[in-house]
């Protein structure tokens, strides 16, 4: 065979046909099932990622809240309390409620909010144990004429002294209010009981110092009273002497020395 013929035969040779593999009846179903499994795995992963993101955001929020200062938390608490009070007020607008009941309700709401805020601030601290150690209790003074008008003395800065100057200020505020009643019959008995209650939480050494200070005051009072008594006696004696001299000097001799009734023979 000539070379040209060989070339023609090589060019006429066609590539072998591609034989398509026949799919089995269940092969398509397996592909669908694999797709579903992949979709389920993807959904689970998305849920896990969402939960992880939520947990991370919550942790970041808690960390940010812990970093806030006490003043910031108190301010947020006040804003929340005002918001709750306004919401309660709007809800009760249609109800038949007088002004006194409204104020009482708002006060209860505020108190509940304060308690919740205290729990948020102190967390798992045993508040009852702290109270037993002498933590101040709420001292609410209300007006007998208007019970809705009340003041919590324990919340006032004056009654939360910590420094020497603050205690001095508390003293200068209370003493004039209390000693103004010193002339009343029950004041002395009240002062005794008040003093005992006042030093009840102190140790014996501090109580002894206070007792010594009271003894010093008692001795000073005794000296003052004795000096006053001596001065009073001297003044009284001087007044009595002056009165006697004045009475003696001012006595008038009313005897009549006229010659009426006397005869010449009377001198014989």
Curated annotation (Swiss-Prot):
GO BP terms in the entry: formation of cytoplasmic translation initiation complex
Keywords: Coiled coil, Cytoplasm, Initiation factor, Protein biosynthesis
Region Disordered, annotated ranges: 1-117, 219-242
Residues in coiled coil: 40-95
Keyword Cytoplasm set for record: yes
Gene3D superfamilies, per the entry: Eukaryotic translation initiation factor 3 like domains
Pfam families: eIF3_subunit
Bias type Basic and acidic residues, positions: 45-65, 72-86, 100-117, 220-232
Source species, domain of life: Eukaryota
Family of the protein in this entry: Belongs to the eIF-3 subunit J family.
Record's protein name: Eukaryotic translation initiation factor 3 subunit J
Organism: Aspergillus clavatus (strain ATCC 1007 / CBS 513.65 / DSM 816 / NCTC 3887 / NRRL 1 / QM 1276 / 107)
């Amino acid at each position: 065979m000539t070379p040209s013929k060989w070339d023609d035969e090589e060019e006429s040779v066609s590539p072998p046909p591609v034989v398509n593999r026949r799919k089995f009846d269940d092969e398509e179903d397996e592909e669908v099932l694999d797709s579903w499994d992949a979709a389920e795995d993807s959904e689970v992963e998305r849920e896990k990622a969402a939960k992880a993101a939520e947990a991370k955001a919550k942790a970041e929020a808690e960390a940010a809240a812990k970093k806030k200062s006490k003043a910031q938390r108190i301010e947020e608490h006040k804003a929340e309390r005002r918001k709750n009070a306004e919401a309660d007020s709007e809800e009760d607008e249609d109800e038949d409620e007088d002004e006194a009941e409204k104020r009482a309700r708002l006060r209860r709401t505020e108190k509940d909010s304060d308690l919740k805020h205290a729990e948020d601030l102190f967390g798992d601290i045993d508040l009852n144990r702290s109270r037993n150690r002498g933590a101040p209790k709420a001292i609410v003074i209300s007006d007998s004429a208007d019970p809705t008008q009340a003041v919590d003395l324990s919340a006032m800065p004056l009654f939360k002294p910590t420094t020497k100057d603050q205690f001095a200020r508390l003293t200068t505020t209370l003493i004039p209010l209390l000693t103004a009643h010193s002339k009343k019959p029950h004041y002395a008995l009240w002062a005794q009981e008040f003093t005992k209650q006042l030093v009840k939480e102190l140790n014996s050494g501090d109580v002894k110092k206070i007792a010594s200070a009271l003894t010093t005051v008692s001795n000073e009072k005794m000296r003052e009273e004795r000096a006053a008594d001596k001065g009073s006696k001297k003044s009284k004696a001087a007044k009595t002497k002056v009165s006697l001299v004045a009475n003696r000097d001012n006595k008038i001799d009313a005897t009549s020395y006229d010659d009426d009734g006397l005869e010449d023979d009377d001198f014989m």
